[in-house]
A protein has these predicted regions:
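A solvent-exposed interaction/effector surface
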Residues: 2-10, 14-222
């Protein structure tokens, strides 16, 4: 049974935008740890609903642009799914009333994935940025983005190799951690699927040794 669920006290996801008060709990995707080996885990994730956008640029520029686009959707640039009228839905605290929009609770992490068959964090120029939506939502009841650059998508249950590490996320360091993840997978004969992903959990003021970063690499069911 999928049983793991963590909560963080506050987050800006390392991209320099303040958005959650320290008292706010952040929901994370549910998963079960299948195998653990030092800084590596094989996880089985439950199905999720994500908001995503495709952006161009280097890793840092694309992360910032994609974050802002999806944050704009989450914080009000949306249309309620069950009504032609636009109305504020108070899902977080403190509540700020804005007509004609719905506010969606935040989750962690934000995920960055190179696109167009590109697996190098150093050379990729097109990226998929996504946020996992709170678990009470489905495609039927979640507010819909007004910006066509942001789309909603259901992601089925999947397996990932996850490489956990702390510190800063320079492009070179992320590539090194990605290479280590691929090497770990190859040595254990896992079948890799798609491009690696970088997931970040912490606000920018978090001390480097306390930052939580993860390289995620999808694999076939072990």
């Amino acid at each position: 049974m999928l049983k793991h669920q963590n909560y963080l006290a506050s987050i800006t996801l390392g991209l320099g935008i303040l958005w959650i008060t320290p008292a706010m709990a952040i929901e994370e995707p549910k998963y079960e740890v299948v195998t653990a080996d030092a800084q590596f885990e094989v996880r089985h994730y439950a199905p999720i609903l994500i908001a995503e956008t495709i952006v161009e640029g280097d890793m840092d520029a694309a992360s910032s642009k994609g974050f802002r686009l999806i944050a704009d959707f989450i914080f009000g640039n949306n249309q309620q799914a069950d009504s032609d009228k636009k109305a504020k839905i108070a899902m977080t605290a403190p509540v700020t009333v804005e007509p004609q929009s719905s506010k969606i609770a935040m989750t962690a992490p934000v995920t960055v994935e190179p696109q167009a068959e590109e697996t190098s964090m150093k050379t990729a120029k097109t990226w998929r940025i996504n946020f996992v939506m709170p678990s009470q939502y489905t495609l039927a009841n979640i507010p819909k983005p007004k910006n066509n650059a942001v789309t909603l998508r259901e992601v089925p249950s999947k397996y990932f190799i996850v490489h956990k590490y702390s510190g800063f996320n320079t492009v070179s360091r992320v590539q090194t951690k990605t290479d280590e993840t691929v090497e770990w997978a190859i040595k254990r004969s896992y079948k890799m699927i798609g491009a690696p992903q970088l997931s970040r959990y912490d606000p920018p003021w978090t001390l480097p040794m306390f930052r939580r970063n993860e390289i995620m690499l999808e694999i076939a069911a072990p």
